[in-house]
């Protein structure tokens, strides 16, 4: 979790509170709207998990994803093409439909009229993908693949969390109980709820 909607996320999010308890250094790689695809990429490609003592990984809604946007080439007057170097991690584009899509997908009251608003690139493609290509079964399978990939790849102590209240998988901790208690306007946990999560994770680690 990045700590969205907190006044001071770097100090108030549960990952920081947990590290304070153990007198440990926090390494938080979360971004707003990140996907399980991004988690697995960071776990298998961008980082070496064995450099750490403990992993607390919060999976998210399986409808989210990402794609790699290559750096465009520029043609100079001499006719030669030059490709501006850019770090690969900066070229990954997140794809995160509004939460109403999750509700609609699972047969709940979710208005998807504005589905494409959060798609910065290829909006028509992603709208078609989410409306006509994917399904609950598809996303459940995708989540299961990510879940077991993380479990099997993490060779250090791991606490695996989720905010997906529709999941059927045995996570160590479910962070969404379906209510809006102790949550901010946009549904993110407030300072007190982050304290509660840190306490729950400590109990799991005992």
Task: Describe the residue ranges of each PLM region.
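Serine-esterase "nucleophile elbow" of acetyl-processing enzymes
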Residues: 1-38, 42-47, 190, 196
